Amino acid sequence: SKKQASKCLAGFIAVPLTVVYLAVGWYLCSNVWETDYTLKTDKKSGDIRIVQFADSHVGTTFHGDGFAKYMEEIQKLDPDVVLITGDFVDDDTSKEDMIQCCEALGKLKTKYGVYFSFGNHDKGYYDPSYRGYSGDDLIAELEKNNVNVLQDDTVLIDDRFYIIGRQDRSEEMEKGGHRASMEELTKDLDSSKFTVVMDH
């Protein structure tokens, strides 16, 4: 009947479309693209080469070895500063991968350092026993590898520009914590200097 034929046709179309959709999703999730921006400002900051990345979701996308290779590629860009704006790890990142990735970050050579602010996945949604480490353990490992962790903090770099690292919104919305407003974070800053905001 026509009804059965149209159901079969819908099934024949739905299955390949689903496969294509999942394949494209996997490809986009597992590959990294470089996007370059040049910003011009009247502020007296001079030239600054910033490399920023987010949403690596180590363990879901690639593991520690893959992340370390990407850090080698970032090093070739000769950044003045590296900014990691959240979801570096998530609930499926093993402790071994987390440590290996923090060590890879610690090997980066930059003029002004590496800075990290939290995303909604970094501290984990489950009990720390699920992945073998807590948000505090992640902070300790990052800091051990000379990564500066910013949680509603502002840093003046070389008297040239500011970096503001915001607490993730999930801290306030899902975990009952506090997140400072931009007004609070910028009220004492010199407006003649360039400001970079890290906000997942």
Where are these regions (language model features)?
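Non-catalytic terminal accessory segments
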Residues: 1-30
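Short, functional N-terminal and low-complexity linear motifs
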Residues: 4-6, 16-18, 37-41, 70-74, ...
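Alpha-helical transmembrane signal-anchor/signal-peptide segments
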Residues: 28-44
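Soluble catalytic domains of enzymes that build or remodel membrane lipids, polysaccharides, and related
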Residues: 45-200
